[in-house]
Design a protein with these regions (language model features):
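Long, internal low-complexity/basic segments
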Residues: 21-67, 74, 79, 107, ...
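Active-site segment of extracytoplasmic enzymes that catalyze sulfate/phosphate-ester chemistry
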Residues: 27-29, 38, 45, 78-166, ...
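Core domains of carbohydrate- and sulfate-ester-processing enzymes
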Residues: 28, 33-42, 109, 119-122, ...
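Active-site His/acidic residue clusters
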Residues: 79, 204, 254, 269, ...
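C-terminal cap/loop subdomain of S1 sulfatases and analogous C-terminal strand-loop tails that border
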Residues: 188-198, 352-375, 392-396, 400, ...
Length: 554
């Protein structure tokens, strides 16, 4: 466990005219949460005492054991694409197992994430907006960057309190040693170093399907090219590791070429390893935290022999297949007899890759406009379902706003690990245990700040959303939308910013004042692929080329 400073902090929100934070909470929250707490603190404190008694009763019923946590994060799926029988008919994709899972628990109808995969995953892991940690954009090839060692992940928080921790599947938090999951609190990790562009798009099969232009020589070969190393090559694929040890690449031998078949086998292996981890973790006396982040449905090749779905698109096909795989995971939880003491969360990380043609992928924007990389609702509003039988009401839904960072703080609360959350930095995640246990209208957030990379693009407050105006434009002139009346953010109404513009600007000022007080952390930097003991010669050559032009301090 990395060092965690346990300093006592009483946030000086008198600076904002809000008053003092409640004394028993040493976590430094963003200003907007403290603004809400100044209005609801006594009520929330009373609720928390009731919740503590409830959680104590649940632990007593389970022999004193804290709940297991299984967190499943699906890549690039539009809101409504899974978990909804009606919309299954609209899209021609059946997700019966995820639909059933959704009916067995709570549907979070206003779950917000970050606009793309790396930022969302960093937000979950750290409980912080990724702009604070430097993980604010997606990287495809070698970068020599990653999640810094100074960040304290939810795996480290839970591990410090006695949880066993495992990660299987997509990681996408960097290619440097300090950023690997087994160096960020996980006891076991099986993961690819990069992501699906490398694994399913940079292949001959994708070139044959006309999904990739210019990378493979069979689609384009330029005799005038001078730079022979412009196209990424020699990238590490999948690795496995345990905490305290080195990683080993397991997918490719020296000189072997990555293919679509490798990608299929990788997806199938991660499914098997998730089931294996469930069985292994369920044997022990300790509670566990298991992350499963599948690579599918992202798939850039029409590789199925026969369509499973009515839709037939190659993303759609893999989403329907993934639904069956999720069913296997749910069934395994039942077989192991741990269902009543296991919190399972299944959600998407952001909207679909909308700049990739829906005529090929089979996925589309559905209700909300936009998708991956966008601050629009289609980029950051996702399906999210939570199940904990006997604790969370089955068949329930909540319209309360939740942000992916809230899972960090909520998981810590459920695992009696709040004391291990760092208290020397802003934690954006809000404890939403009350919402899970008491249901709709018990959320503690009515706002979201939405960034694209390092730029604040939108602010959500209640049902209203302001697109941050360009410099020099007053708040009263900014586009403001009522998301109930205009969910696609197409018709800003002049009557909204005239009364809300100043309030939105005040929200931004409070947020920026906290950033000034607690500046962003530095992004982790280093030599790519260190800590992997069996690097292929081609990977070593790629690293050497990359390092040849890097500043000396790296």
């Amino acid at each position: 466990m990395k060092h965690i400073r346990t300093v006592h902090f009483v946030i000086a929100l008198c600076l904002f005219g809000i008053g003092l934070a409640h004394a028993e909470n040493d976590i430094i929250n963003d200003a907007e949460y403290e603004y809400l707490r100044s209005q609801h603190g006594p009520k929330w404190d009373a609720e928390d005492k009731e919740i503590d008694r409830t959680l104590g009763d649940i632990r007593e019923k389970n022999g004193g054991k804290r709940p297991n946590i299984l967190y499943i994060l699906i890549d690039d799926v539009s809101f409504g694409q899974m978990g909804n029988r009606t919309l299954n008919y609209v899209t021609g994709i059946k997700t019966p197992r995820i639909n059933k899972f959704a009916e067995e628990g709570l549907s979070l109808m206003r779950m917000y994430t970050e606009p793309s995969c790396t930022p969302t995953r960093a937000a979950l892991l750290t409980g912080r907006h990724p702009v604070r940690t430097g993980l604010k954009e997606v990287k495809v090839a070698l970068v020599g960057e990653g999640l810094p060692a100074s960040e304290v992940t939810i795996a480290e928080v839970l591990s410090a309190s006695g949880y066993r921790t495992s990660h299987v599947g997509k990681w996408h938090q960097g290619d440097i040693e300090q950023s690997y999951p087994h160096n960020q609190g996980f006891d076991y990790a099986a993961f690819p170093l990069h992501q699906q562009v490398q694994l399913s798009l940079m292949t001959d099969e994708a070139a044959d399907s006309f999904r990739l232009i210019g990378y493979a020589k069979k689609t384009q070969s330029n005799a005038f090219a001078v730079d022979k190393k412009f196209k990424p090559s020699g990238l590490v694929t999948g690795v496995e590791a345990k905490k305290g040890g080195s990683a080993r690449e397991i997918d490719l031998k020296p000189g072997e070429k990555w293919t679509q078949d490798h990608y299929i086998r990788m997806n199938e292996r991660y499914q098997r390893q998730t089931l294996e981890q469930l069985r292994e973790l369920a044997k022990g006396d300790k509670p566990f935290f298991l992350q499963y982040w599948p690579l599918w449905p992202l798939n850039f090749v029409n590789d199925q022999e026969e369509n499973l779905s009515h839709n037939g698109g190659h993303f759609a096909e893999k989403l329907q297949r993934l639904d069956g795989m999720m069913g296997e995971v749910f069934d395994e939880v039942d077989k192991l007899g741990i269902v009543d003491n296991t919190l399972v969360v299944l959600m998407a990380d952001n909207g679909l890759m909308h700049f990739y043609p829906s005529s090929a992928s089979g996925l589309n924007q559905l209700i909300y406009r936009g998708g991956k990389t966008d601050h629009l609702e289609g980029g950051v509003r996702v399906d999210a379902f939570v199940r904990w039988p006997g604790v969370i009401e089955a068949g329930s839904a909540a319209g309360d706003i939740v942000h992916v960072t809230d899972l960090y703080t909520t998981f810590a609360r459920l695992g009696q690990a709040t004391e291990y959350i760092p208290t020397d930095r802003v934690i954006d995640g809000i404890d939403q245990t009350a919402l899970l246990l008491k249901g709709e209208h018990h959320g503690r957030r009515d706002y979201v700040y939405i960034y694209e990379n390092e730029i604040l693009r939108s602010v959500v407050k209640q049902e209203f959303k302001m697109h941050v105006p360009r410099p020099g434009l007053p708040g009263a002139g900014a586009p403001v939308f009522n998301l109930y009346r205009d969910p696609r953010e197409e018709e800003p109404f002049v009557g909204l910013p005239l009364w809300s513009g100043a309030s939105f600007q005040d929200m931004i000022k409070r947020h920026m004042m906290m950033i000034a007080k607690y500046p962003h952390a530095k992004l982790g930097k280093g030599r790519p692929y260190e800590g992997i003991e069996n690097l292929r010669p081609e990977s070593k050559d790629t690293v050497a080329t990359f390092m040849s032009w890097q500043p000396a301090q790296q």
